[in-house]
């Protein structure tokens, strides 16, 4: 859910899609966040619509949000599946004040790197080398010092195969790798 704003005529303006919902501001720039809160998700060829006939076949190259158990199961874990070369997951917004490291939790069958940027064009980014060949969730991390302030985070997979993205963790000097919230 996003906060709605009225214009001077009393009409509602279109709300920006964010990962914050009704948080009334950016999310804290440290801690563990599940990939399912992505507000942007697209493949190398753009976004896909799943309200078309036979979306599984039509959009087989696109990432999507799914879960590991049936609907209604309280223990189901949601994640982004099928991230292939060029796939992007975007999250808005975080108040990042003292970043030191960023970690990601993945599984699947892929070899490449995850680029992390505060812009969707990835002109400046940090790179996390990854190699997975298992359905077991694995962690990868790198230093993060270039992103500060009220920032979006975009994750772009570049490589071979297909990976699943479960969560990411932002670390600062104050909480350097206290992994109590990880799976």
Predicted regions and their residues:
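Extracytoplasmic
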Residues: 12-183
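Beta-propeller blade signature
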Residues: 1-7
């Amino acid at each position: 859910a996003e906060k709605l704003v009225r214009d001077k005529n009393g009409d509602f303006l279109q709300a920006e899609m964010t990962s914050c919902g009704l948080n009334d501001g950016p999310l804290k720039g440290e801690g563990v966040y599940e990939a399912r809160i992505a507000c942007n998700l697209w493949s190398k060829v753009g976004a896909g619509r799943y309200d078309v006939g036979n979306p599984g076949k039509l959009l087989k190259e696109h990432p999507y949000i799914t879960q590991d158990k049936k609907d209604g199961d309280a223990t189901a874990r949601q994640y982004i599946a099928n991230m292939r070369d060029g796939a992007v997951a975007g999250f808005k917004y975080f108040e990042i004040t003292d970043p030191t490291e960023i970690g990601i939790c993945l599984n699947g069958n892929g070899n490449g790197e995850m680029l992390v940027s505060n812009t969707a064009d990835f002109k400046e980014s940090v790179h996390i080398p990854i190699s997975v060949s298992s359905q077991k969730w694995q962690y990868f991390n790198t230093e993060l010092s270039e992103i500060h302030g009220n920032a979006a985070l975009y994750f772009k997979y570049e490589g071979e195969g297909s990976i699943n993205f479960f969560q990411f963790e932002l670390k600062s000097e104050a909480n350097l790798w206290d992994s109590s919230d990880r799976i």
